[in-house]
Design a protein with these regions (language model features):
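C-terminal helical subdomain
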Residues: 151, 169-184
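A glycine-rich helix->loop->beta "capping" turn
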Residues: 22-25, 45-58, 64, 103, ...
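The beta1-alpha1 cofactor-binding region of Rossmann-like NAD(H)/NADP(H)-dependent oxidoreductases
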Residues: 9, 30-41, 73
């Protein structure tokens, strides 16, 4: 659910079922990344189950698109809490684990709205540019611990972009088209 209220974990549960059907192991948690305690619980459950954490993909998101004049500070804060602070919470909670392991891979998702701007997305653009600054600094800090961090600014047809992109284009922009870059 893109509203940011009463998040829906069904998509993650579906992915868990798909992974398990192929013989893999997976776990869904449904943490609200804007809540540090929920993120810490999610990471603790991951460590309890597998004993290590190798990869983090920061990809949670919501939209509150309005021109800057019409948008509220509350919506601005909500968007930055999920996109920027959610990335901070997840990365901070995993960072020392990865450093201690001397191995970790972190992906943050940015957006062309953060890199170039997009009308009505001041809050989103600010958050997405913020994760770029974070990534650039952490790439330097993590290098000596073999913790690598990269950013993607993908365009994909997702639950968040459904209804914003032409139906024909949406059908071509599957998340699977972004997967090779995430796995790099």
């Amino acid at each position: 659910q893109v509203s940011g209220e009463g998040a829906n974990s069904q998509a993650s549960l579906d992915v868990v079922a798909e992974i398990e059907a192929l013989g893999g192991e997976a776990m869904a948690h449904g943490a609200n990344v804007a809540d540090l305690e929920q993120v810490q619980d999610m990471v603790a459950q991951t460590m309890d189950r597998w004993g290590r954490l190798d990869i983090l993909v920061n990809n949670a998101g919501i939209l509150r698109d309005k021109s800057f004049s019409k948008g509220s500070v509350e919506d601005f804060r909500l968007v930055t809490d999920v996109h920027l602070m959610g990335t901070v919470h997840c990365t901070k909670t995993c960072w020392d684990i990865m450093k201690e392991q001397e191995y970790g891979r972190i992906v943050v998702t940015s957006s062309s709205s953060g890199l170039y701007g997009n009308f009505g997305q001041t809050n989103y653009g600010a958050a997405k540019m913020g994760v770029i600054g974070m990534m650039n600094t952490l790439a330097q800090e993590g290098a000596k611990y073999n913790v690598k961090i990269n950013a993607l600014a993908p365009t994909a047809g997702t639950r968040m972009t459904e209804g914003l992109i032409d139906e024909n284009a949406f059908a071509l922009l599957t998340p699977a088209t972004v997967t090779p870059a995430v796995l790099y």
